[in-house]
């Protein structure tokens, strides 16, 4: 299984243009900031190149 840090959900970088079609968060560098609303922090994540 992919290693994740405090995050049961897929994270997306907010500055990724294709966040709706690509998971742009490089795991395991994502952490949930609010598990109730499923908000994740991509502070150390780098957005991958996405093709829409």
Curated annotation (Swiss-Prot):
Ranges occupied by Sequence repeats: 43-47, 48-52
Induction remark: Both MT-I and MT-II genes are regulated by copper ion in a concentration-dependent fashion, and both are inducible by silver but not by cadmium salts.
Gene Ontology MF term list: copper ion binding
Keywords: Copper, Metal-binding, Metal-thiolate cluster, Repeat
GO biological process per UniProt: cellular response to copper ion; cellular response to silver ion
Listed transmembrane segments: none
rRNA processing recorded as keyword: no
Further information: MT-II might bind nearly 10 mol eq of Cu(+).
Function (record text): The metallothioneins are involved in the cellular sequestration of toxic metal ions.
Family named by the database record: Belongs to the metallothionein superfamily. Type 10 family.
Protein name listed in UniProt: Metallothionein-2
Gene of this entry: MT-II
């Amino acid at each position: 299984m992919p290693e994740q840090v405090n995050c049961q959900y897929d994270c997306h970088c907010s500055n990724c243009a294709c966040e709706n079609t690509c998971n742009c968060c490089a795991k395991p560098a994502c952490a949930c900031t609010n598990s109730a609303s499923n908000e994740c922090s991509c502070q150390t994540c780098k957005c991958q190149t996405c093709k829409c």
